[in-house]
Amino acid sequence: MTPWTETCGQIRPLIEESDGAAAEVHHLEITDAKLHYHERTDEIYHIIDGHGRMLLDDEEVDLKPGLVIYVPRGVKHRAWGNLKVLVICIPAGVLKDVHEIGEPPHTA
């Protein structure tokens, strides 16, 4: 499937809701994601390549290859840097559950 740009960056679905799956798996290339949250979806980010930072509510986390981050539903989050990420979304349907809330300030 051809990648496209979403709130988090360039997305390439690997397993989708339309496949009948209970969860979705996406490959993301993130440079500067928009601040957002999900009402019904938990996410697990596995950093494959690159470095950056992630804002989880009011906490900033350094991102590097091999790191796994759990983002529960309801947590405002965004990432920035030069990142290649595998994201597992539970349950499936995350693209219908994205609620953008604007651009926050962040440290470099």
Residue ranges and their predicted role:
Residues D32, R40-E43, I47-G52, D57:
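Glycine- and acidic-residue-biased ligand/ion/polar-headgroup-sensing regions
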Residues T2-L35, T41, I88:
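A short glycine-rich, His/Asp/Glu-containing loop-to-beta-strand
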Residues D58-G74:
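Short acidic-glycine-tyrosine-enriched beta hairpin
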Residues G50, G66, V85:
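Short hydrophobic/aromatic patches on the structural cores and recognition surfaces of FHA
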Residues H38-R40, G81-N82:
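Short glycine/proline-enriched turns and hinge-like loops at secondary-structure junctions
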Residues R73-V98:
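Ligand-binding loop in jelly-roll beta-barrel domains
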Residues L95-A108:
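Acidic/histidine-enriched, glycine/proline-rich intrinsically disordered or flexible terminal extensions
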